[in-house]
């Protein structure tokens, strides 16, 4: 069986046509283990290349098999034509849902002329394809210190939703009015993962981390005045949190927080 898995891995990296996803591969391996098909028959049925070379991009067509989630398109700094080209390549590889982050309105309008795009301007998230059924173990809570943090929060929330998670939004519950957060204490205590998003001094993550019994993913934002240094003060505050179980992603990185929260919620 070890040899067969090695053969499968080698063929995955070599073959040129994509016809299988992770679930199908698992079913294939189970059929081999049960004797329903031979290793050779299974190997012959797998047609996957590791990437599709577009010249300006090498689309990772094998990522869902390795990581359980397909490649995400980072829209910022890409031309609208490049984004559309990558989308087309992914659809050719039978991707069911494509997530595009940091997508401008101009790029969204261009891509929407060619594909069925669901675009949210606040989060700059573009989604092509069907949203999956909710398959996470429990709920992910996304909380913000202020209304100004919502664009980053929506990037996190929509990312988590694309990967099949139920998301509860708690917006504008920062430390300037603790009673707002305490009014949702049951939601905090019953979450499986919490994403705490805040600018200014970034205190929200520590406060939530001191109450919750689940992992807290802290997201510093660039919201704030001069000494906020574009989110650096919030970042350092969150990194130095005294609360246990608080991890930190990069400034304004809602996508990273949503992705990590989804992984935790599927464990």
Residue ranges and their predicted role:
Residues 223, 227-267:
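C-terminal binding/interaction regions
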Residues 83, 149-154, 178-179, 198-207, ...:
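Short glycine/serine/threonine-rich phosphate/pyrophosphate-binding segments
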Residues 19-104, 109, 113-115:
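Long amphipathic alpha-helical segments
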Residues 183-221:
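Glycine-rich phosphate-binding loop
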Residues 137-177:
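Glycine-rich phosphate/diphosphate-binding loop of Rossmann-like nucleotide-binding domains
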């Amino acid at each position: 069986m070890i040899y067969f898995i090695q053969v499968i891995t080698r063929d995955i990296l070599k073959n040129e046509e994509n016809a299988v996803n992770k679930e199908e591969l698992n079913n294939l391996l189970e059929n081999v283990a049960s004797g329903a098909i031979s290793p050779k028959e299974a190997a012959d049925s797998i047609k996957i290349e590791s990437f599709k070379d577009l010249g300006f991009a090498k689309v990772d067509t094998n990522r869902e098999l390795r990581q359980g989630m397909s490649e995400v398109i980072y829209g910022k700094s890409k031309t609208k034509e490049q984004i559309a080209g990558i989308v087309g390549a992914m659809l050719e590889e039978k991707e069911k849902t494509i997530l595009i982050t940091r997508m401008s309105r101009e790029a969204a309008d261009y891509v929407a002329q060619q594909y069925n795009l669901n675009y949210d301007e606040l989060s700059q998230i573009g989604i092509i394809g069907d949203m999956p059924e909710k398959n996470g173990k429990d709920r992910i809570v996304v909380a913000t210190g202020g209304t100004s943090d919502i664009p980053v929060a929506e990037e996190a929330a929509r990312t988590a939703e694309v990967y099949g998670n139920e998301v509860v939004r708690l917006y504008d519950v920062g430390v300037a009015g603790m009673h707002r957060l305490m009014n949702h204490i049951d939601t905090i205590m019953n979450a499986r993962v919490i994403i705490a998003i805040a600018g200014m001094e970034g205190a929200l993550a520590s406060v939530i981390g001191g109450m919750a019994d689940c992992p807290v993913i802290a997201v510093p934002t660039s919201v704030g005045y001069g000494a906020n240094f574009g989110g650096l003060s919030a970042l350092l505050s969150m990194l130095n949190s005294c609360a246990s179980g608080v991890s930190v992603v990069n400034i304004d990185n809602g996508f990273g927080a949503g992705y990590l929260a989804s992984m935790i919620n599927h464990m």
